[in-house]
């Protein structure tokens, strides 16, 4: 399906080379301030046009809110947003028709939809479709702010180069002032070199990102189905190219003795809390009030300028393809922005479920 969420539901639509990408957001209370500029601001964070090989399409985001907003405020009705596709060059993909790219969803889409799948630019499986998720995230982030919560992320690994520095949440937010959101300057320099190397080789690189959510109130999530971690993980794996996820200290935690891994419980400002936060803000599927943090990894972009073995499905014969069109050397930076967005959507959904944001009366005025 193309819908995510229970109380806050988003339905995305559109393909990479179609007329538009879009999203319908249902469940937003009336009275939330929202403009097209709010959405465009978030979309521009995913562009990275200052590093052309990360976004050769570099498409100015033309955003239109079609419904659900009047005079700068939400109406409590479904919000429909479209982002128009303008810089489309489908001719690059003509020779790839019925010749699925190794590592790409082309092959799976053929198995499911037959000849009817749209292969141009990756179609429905393109990273371009995450623009719709980012648009929904712009709304969800505003909803989180009502509860005093916010989301931010950074790149922790790219092309095998890992960060090696201690940092705080404030450092994560400040990293967005750099060419890429990386807290470690030495690692950033090496990552930029790796990007240049991949472009020269006609190849691609993967990597990992970390997303934080701070100010999230305790008590969100359910003991079994509806765990906050499960919902965020499901959302994370909806992003094209996602291959792995670590919550809190993740695999490092799995290697510890139980006595080391446990977060001691203490009292601060008259309230119980965790003295440390190795677990990443969630116990038993329920938030405990400490910061949420997790890491996700994304595979290298499947489209590369190197010969790759595939099958001509029209003839059922082996063949070789070499992509000649535009491609992102890495999807990791864009994926980070999408992961921030879908995390915000999942958390806003749970705030509505818990009654911490209500829809039965308008916000503000």
UniProtKB/Swiss-Prot annotation:
Single Gene Ontology MF annotation: chorismate synthase activity
Gene3D superfamilies recorded: Chorismate synthase AroC (3.60.150.10)
Residues that hold FMN according to the record: 124-126, 284, 299-303, 326
Reactions this protein catalyses: 5-O-(1-carboxyvinyl)-3-phosphoshikimate = chorismate + phosphate
Residues reported in the UniProt entry to bind NADP(+): 46
Cofactor(s) demanded: FMNH2
Top-rank EC class of the record's enzyme: lyase
PANTHER family hit by this protein: CHORISMATE SYNTHASE
Entry's cofactor comment: Reduced FMN (FMNH(2)).
Entry EC number(s): 4.2.3.5
Keywords from the UniProt entry: Amino-acid biosynthesis, Aromatic amino acid biosynthesis, FAD, Flavoprotein, FMN, Lyase, NADP
Alphabetized SUPFAM superfamilies for the sequence: Chorismate synthase, AroC
Pathway: Metabolic intermediate biosynthesis; chorismate biosynthesis; chorismate from D-erythrose 4-phosphate and phosphoenolpyruvate: step 7/7
HAMAP family associated with the record: Chorismate_synth
One GO CC term on file: cytosol
Role this protein plays: This reaction introduces a second double bond into the aromatic ring system.
Protein name: Chorismate synthase
